[in-house]
Design a protein with these regions (language model features):
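Secondary-structure transition/capping motifs at alpha-helix termini
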Residues: 12-26, 51-64, 76-77, 98-99, ...
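Structured loops at beta-to-helix junctions and adjacent beta-edge loops in soluble globular domains
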Residues: 1, 7-9, 71-73, 109-111, ...
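Cys/His-rich finger/ribbon microdomains and the adjacent scaffold used
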Residues: 1-35, 44, 51-56, 62-67, ...
Length: 215
């Protein structure tokens, strides 16, 4: 596991670990996402192997990962790590049945900053479910109307793109969801006043939302 990322870029090469051409084109890894528990074993040895392979000329970089992000853990009640042995594992099946998988996906991102642990409480998923219903109604109510974009709509559209982009780039995933909620509320208010929202703004909203609620 200390050098698997090298084989990913050249896994059919039976002559060498990785071709220099492919290594130069695709490595080092841009972003490594993993739990902090890997820091003292896998990540440490990955650095050793990478530096060694660089020293002997197999690759031309001496650090395996450009950026590292350690995500937090979703815990059970009282902050206890979920495990089958403790009997505190939460099955998603009931939540998916009652609220849909998109609500569950977005709620998991919304519970807190991704780098921190968060205690699981499924009561909060109802708020995300209501938000998605509100957004769906906004899209359905406006999709067949020929609404001309107002300055206010264009402003919200541009602000939405900016907020989602900058928060994604900083891995502030919980605030990405809150930005969707905030701007959707603004668009709902505009729709009541203008009779709907223009198609470009709706399309932008749907495209930005797709990675978080694809269904």
């Amino acid at each position: 596991s200390s050098w698997y990322f090298l084989r990913y870029v050249d896994n059919h090469n039976n002559e060498e670990l990785v071709s220099r051409e492919k290594a130069d084109a695709m490595l080092p890894v841009d972003m490594y996402i993993g739990g902090v528990e890997h820091a003292v074993l896998h990540l440490l040895y990955s650095r050793f192997y990478t530096k060694f392979l660089c020293d002997i000329g197999v690759i031309d970089f001496d650090e395996p990962f450009v950026k590292l992000f350690n995500q937090g853990m979703i815990t059970g009640k009282n902050g206890i790590k979920m495990s089958k042995s403790k009997g505190n594992v939460v099955s998603p099946d009931d939540l998916v049945r009652d609220y849909g998988c998109d609500s569950l996906r977005m709620y998991e991102l919304f519970v807190g900053p991704p780098e921190l642990d968060a205690e699981w409480d499924d009561r909060g998923i109802d708020g995300v479910y209501r938000f998605l219903k509100k957004l769906w109604n906004l899209l359905m109510d406006s999709k067949d109307k020929d609404i001309k974009p107002t300055k206010e709509m264009i402003k919200v559209r541009h602000k939405l793109v900016y907020d989602i982009t900058t928060r994604l780039e900083s891995f502030s995933l919980n605030t990405v969801i809150s930005a969707f909620m905030e701007h959707t509320n603004t668009l709902v208010a505009i729709a009541k006043k203008e009779g709907g929202v223009d198609r470009d703004t709706l399309d932008t909203l749907a495209v930005l939302l797709a990675p978080f609620a694809p269904h």
